[in-house]
Amino acid sequence: MKKPELLAPGGSLEKLKTAIDYGADAVYIGGEMFSLRVAAENFSKEDMQEGIKYAHDRGKKVYLTANILPHNDDIEEFEEFVKDIKNYGFDAVLVADLGLFDMMQELAPEIPIHVSTQANNINYRSAIKWYKMGATRVVLAREMSFKEIAEFQKKIPEDLELEAFIHGAMCISYSGRCLLSNYMTGRDSNMGACAHPCRWNYKLVEETRPGEYMDVFENERGTFIFNSKDLCTIRHIPELVQSGIASLKIEGRVKTSYYVATVVGAYRREIDRYCADPENYVFNEAEYEELCKVSHRPYTTGFYFGKPDENSQVYTSSSYIIDYDLIGIVK
């Protein structure tokens, strides 16, 4: 049994260091462009180099996210960006677009390529095609079950790694295919500027009665039609490890350092405990309680055990649960 990599979000240099200090094996970060997280602090080129050195000095890895779906105007800028960063020492780059994939191979062939979840990786034939083109890892769509992942593993080459999300926010659509934000606000979700209209509360209008807004009820509290709970799999470490997934990924580049420290620490401890003694492993419920101390929505296991039902949605509010405040950092 191989211990999987624990992959953490690094929305800033401080968060990268926090993730590593609390047990991450690798951190994924974004530059000031191309990384699909406009709201994150992101990394200057100087921060990138400092972060990579910090990680490598401790035997850890840093992956660069370049997983936007670019327009023509982005291509020349991306070429210059790659020329600037290709010698920084990134351990891999995440892309979702075929054009950027091709450019990475042309401009920086020494950097391994991981295919982002934005590419909607939900079947093994797609994964095999990415592998034949040169990808070393495929990030699975969040919409896959353990059963589907097991079948996936049987069909793909042994040296093609799989990465999967284990904690964090869930999109209501297949990642990369939602255009609600573009249509309703002009903010492009595929360029990192999603306004999250899936979590808004909606009213109904009859076309001959403009200005009369009627409530839409799923229950007595109203409706949040697309408002998914957050993914949490801390209680299912045995299934995750036994699935053969190479990298277990935590979502949250726009979250706080406190969030990163708490979530990474909890998963680190449980993964280590299970891998040290699988036969006698018993989940420590205190770790779930730790995860409830960070800003979060109610938790769900997502698609891992089958298609979600109505219990995977939040019907009362689109706001986060915030029951605890950070009062200080002990150094």
Please report, for each region that a protein language model flagged, where it lies by residue.
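Surface-exposed amphipathic alpha-helical tracts and adjacent flexible/coil segments at the periphery
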Residues: 1-21, 26-29, 33, 51-52, ...
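Glycine-rich, positively charged N-terminal anion/phosphate-binding segment
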Residues: 37-54
